[in-house]
Amino acid sequence: GESFGVLELCKILGIRQSALSHHLKILAKAKIVSTRKEGNSIFYRRALLKEDDPYREIKESILEHVDKIPMPDDIKRQIKNIQVERAERSLSFFRKNADKFQIKQGLIVEHTDYASSLHDVIASLNIHDESQIVEVGPGEGELLAELTRKFKNLLALDNSQEMLEKCKNTISSGKCEGVKFMLGDTSIALAKNIKSDLLILNMVLHHIPTPAKTFRDASSLLNRGGHLLIVDLGRHDQDWVRDSCGDIWLGFEEADLNDWGSKVNLEVGQSSYLSLRNGFQIQMRVFTKTINPK
């Protein structure tokens, strides 16, 4: 599931912080919720139950029953408001920094640092040249331009008009063919009945306010046997990337990505890792939509 900060949970539940903190402390002690530090903020999410947890079956039963309880409309509304606030902060960053984004991103990693490894991963998937390839948040379009040499049907999906224009300019100046452009996110793509054989999120997931939902959307967008390719940072504690690069999340644990995938019929495939000189680690993760969903 998604992660929420304490103040966000207070808004969602309409409860005072002191009272909520008391309940969260009990849930954390019972290992029903887990915490992750994002800079100066602590986020809470449903814990990943471990195989050796002696109370695993009891906890699973509790959570299954909780999932069956209808969520009140006012809570759904508050969650949506939180998601909109996060998304707006991210969009605001890209509106203000579209002209400088590549420079800012370069503070963490340059595309050339891992492009060769990324193309090796894509080549290993044996995807037909006429397959539908979708890149979510293509930035200035470097990867898409490279992919036009191998594939004929590509779609650039971005919810930032400014960044989508940057991508269009790159594709146009490179005289690349076979690329279409769509303003919006994965929800918009679903509404327009887009289907994909390869869905790529290249250094994008840490900008998305609801990563677990993105996995759900990805599963719906993929054809059976299609692949979701996540290229992102491993978990880190470099809080400066929030202001400098517009990051919402400080990378991701491998277990989190695996959990989000397993819940939406996306099987874990190959994984590649690349350590950078500045201390960051790039993870390239492939998830395949199962032929026979659970």
Can you annotate each of these PLM segments?
Residues 187-199:
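A short acidic, Gly/Pro-enriched loop at the edge of an enzyme's catalytic core
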